[in-house]
């Protein structure tokens, strides 16, 4: 079979290895290629312009590629990673799948739930790092998938047993064009889910037509206390606060519902679940606190790549002066709602990256102190010179990092290095 992989990345490379083992002819097409060549593994790589839809029998798209890209528009047999993997399931092997999506918190919640479901041989995958084809080849029986809006947009058949949508706030608007498209992508899977499946959804979307018309069973939630009350767990039984408390509560709710589907009693598992969850360590670059040589508090929240994540971070330090490093690739999002919230805080801004001039203009409009630093190192130096012991220095950029860094991880690591440098 002649297979075209649109985009040369982790997901499509894993698929290419699988296709090669099964004696298919595989070609990659990507904008980053300027001429035909073979990659390190010997796969054929072509510039996007060389794609011929008549010379291809199957196209699998890398989720980050826009639906308006010429490759996608020209493709005649386009499938998502999820739909292709779904086509491989049969009577011999079909895993149980739980999908988790949301603007913020999906990685943490996926990791928490995978830890809770360890005894059921759960493995995590999807956006979190492990491509689905690798989970398939390992024949893992229970998949906990962090699922992006891009993957959901391209998927037309595959659906999970349980779908958790944590939240939807403005993000990825450059890709989706507008918020309505972004929300519809997050909800699209509900149009595919049957009566035997379950969707756990934010209460504020209850009246949305897609949700109203979905056959799936539904549970709605509003905040962490209400979720924990439903599970008969006092909020002080968990060692998390703020947005992380909601992530933990929702992981427990999905776990409880999974047990119910398996005809197992929640009360028999509850105490052990709390112990396991309280032993869970939040990943790097998510509200990660550390102190400089003078004992002053700095917070690495580099994973805050959108407005909602930054707002959640600010709530943690409501009563303290905050020195906030803001900026990067804002992905077409209007930052005005963020600045409207700044009125409720004692805050000074340090603008970096490609959106620095936008941040400066909004700061002038809202009368908020702002220094245009452009570079992260300069922002750290400026804060170091004024930061007092009872104040907070926070990197929560409300933007992607790719205008200046290879990833949010590199941005966070450099932030820590600049702070700790003499």
UniProtKB/Swiss-Prot annotation:
It catalyses: UDP-N-acetyl-alpha-D-muramoyl-L-alanine + D-glutamate + ATP = UDP-N-acetyl-alpha-D-muramoyl-L-alanyl-D-glutamate + ADP + phosphate + H(+). The keyword Cell wall biogenesis/degradation applies. One of its GO terms (molecular function) is ATP binding. Pathway: Cell wall biogenesis; peptidoglycan biosynthesis. It is an enzyme of class 6 (ligase). It is found in: Cytoplasm. InterPro entries: Mur-like_cat_sf, Mur_ligase_C_dom_sf, Mur_ligase_cen, MurD. GO terms for biological process: cell division; cell wall organization; peptidoglycan biosynthetic process; regulation of cell shape. Its EC number is 6.3.2.9. Keywords: ATP-binding, Cell cycle, Cell division, Cell shape, Cell wall biogenesis/degradation, Cytoplasm, Ligase, Nucleotide-binding, Peptidoglycan synthesis. One of its GO terms (cellular component) is cytoplasm. Pfam families: Mur_ligase_M. ATP binds at residues 102-108. Cell wall formation. Catalyzes the addition of glutamate to the nucleotide precursor UDP-N-acetylmuramoyl-L-alanine (UMA). Belongs to the MurCDEF family. This is UDP-N-acetylmuramoylalanine--D-glutamate ligase. It comes from Helicobacter pylori (strain G27). The lineage of its organism: Bacteria, Pseudomonadati, Campylobacterota, Epsilonproteobacteria, Campylobacterales.
């Amino acid at each position: 079979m002649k297979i075209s992989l649109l985009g040369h990345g982790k997901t499509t490379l894993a698929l290419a290895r699988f296709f090669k083992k099964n004696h298919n002819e595989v070609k990659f097409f990507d904008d980053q290629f300027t001429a035909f060549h073979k990659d390190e593994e010997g796969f054929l790589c072509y510039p996007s312009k060389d794609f011929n839809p008549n010379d291809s029998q199957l196209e699998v798209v890398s989720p980050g590629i826009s639906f308006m890209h010429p490759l996608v528009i020209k493709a005649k047999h386009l499938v998502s990673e999820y739909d292709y993997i779904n086509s491989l399931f049969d009577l011999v092997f079909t895993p149980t799948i739980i999908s988790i999506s949301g603007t913020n918190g999906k990685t943490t919640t996926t990791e928490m739930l995978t830890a809770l479901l360890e005894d059921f041989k759960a493995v995590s995958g999807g956006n979190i790092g492990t491509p689905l084809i690798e989970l398939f080849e390992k024949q893992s029986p229970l998949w906990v998938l962090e699922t992006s809006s891009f993957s959901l947009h391209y998927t037309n058949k595959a659906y999970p047993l349980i779908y958790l949508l944590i939240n939807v706030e403005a993000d990825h608007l450059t890709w989706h064009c507008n918020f309505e498209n972004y929300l519809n992508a997050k909800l699209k899977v509900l149009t595919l889910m049957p009566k035997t499946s379950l969707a756990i959804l934010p209460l504020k979307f209850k009246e949305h037509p897609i949700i109203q018309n979905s056959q799936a069973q539904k549970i709605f939630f509003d905040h962490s206390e209400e979720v924990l009350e439903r599970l008969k767990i006092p909020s002080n039984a968990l060692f998390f606060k703020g947005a992380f408390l909601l992530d933990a509560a929702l992981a427990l709710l999905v776990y409880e519902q999974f047990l119910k589907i398996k005809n197992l009693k929640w009360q028999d598992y509850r105490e052990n679940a709390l112990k396991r969850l309280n032993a869970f360590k939040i990943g790097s670059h998510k509200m990660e606190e550390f102190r400089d040589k003078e004992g002053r508090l700095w917070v690495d929240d580099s994973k805050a790549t959108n407005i909602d994540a930054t707002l959640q971070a600010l709530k943690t330090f409501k009563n303290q002066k905050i020195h906030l490093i803001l900026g990067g690739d804002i992905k077409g999002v209007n930052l005005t709602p963020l600045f409207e919230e700044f009125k409720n805080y004692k805050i000074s801004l340090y603008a970096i990256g490609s959106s620095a001039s936008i941040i400066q203009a909004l700061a002038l409009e809202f009368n908020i102190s702002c220094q245009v630093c452009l570079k992260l190192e300069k922002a750290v130096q400026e804060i170091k010179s004024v930061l007092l012991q009872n104040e907070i220095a926070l990197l929560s950029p409300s933007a992607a990092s790719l205008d200046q860094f290879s990833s949010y991880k590199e941005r966070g690591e450099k932030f820590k290095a600049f702070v700790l440098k003499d």
